[in-house]
Curated annotation (Swiss-Prot):
Species lineage: Eukaryota, Metazoa, Ecdysozoa, Nematoda, Chromadorea
Region (Disordered): 82-106
Species: Caenorhabditis elegans
Gene: flp-2
Designated name of the protein: FMRFamide-like neuropeptides 2
Biased composition, class Basic and acidic residues, residue ranges: 82-92
Purpose of the protein: FMRFamide-like neuropeptides. Involved in mediating arousal from the sleep-like state called lethargus, which occurs during molting between larval and adult stages, in part by regulating touch sensitivity, and working in concert with neuropeptide pdf-1. Involved in neural modulation of systemic mitochondrial unfolded protein response.
Keyword rRNA-binding among record annotations: no
Knockout-associated phenotype: Knockouts generated by CRISPR-Cas9-mediated gene editing strongly inhibited the peripheral induction of the mitochondrial unfolded protein response.
Signal peptide: 1-27
Length: 106
């Protein structure tokens, strides 16, 4: 009688140890597939900022033409020039944008 009680208690402890890590796993959100160019860029911006929601609640933060082209250049690793470049300043290739580290959203 005591052996079966000890074995059932050990079985319950083993089951709790196996199951406990999985109760904290959050299901991945399925975001809609971006259809337009500015939705795609907004999703990339959300990835670089480290936010989880790519679509803003109020659409007052849309990217303009300059911001979208600068963002696309930055993602491709191309240099972004503002105005005319002085001849003494060389174009530095290979300067790629380092994205933010993956945050642990708890």
């Amino acid at each position: 009688m005591q052996v079966s009680g000890i074995l059932s208690a050990l079985f319950l402890v083993l089951l709790a140890v196996i199951v406990s890590p999985f109760q904290f796993v959050q299901p991945k959100r399925i975001l809609p597939i971006p259809t337009s160019r500015d939705q795609l860029l907004r999703g990339q911006l959300a990835y670089l900022k480290g936010t989880t929601v790519a679509q803003p609640a109020v659409n007052d933060n849309t990217l303009g033409i300059f911001e979208a082209s600068a963002m696309a250049k930055r993602l491709r690793g191309e240099p972004i020039r503002f105005g005319k470049r002085s001849p003494r300043e060389p174009i530095r290739f290979g300067k790629r944008f380092n994205p933010l580290p993956d945050y642990d959203f708890q």
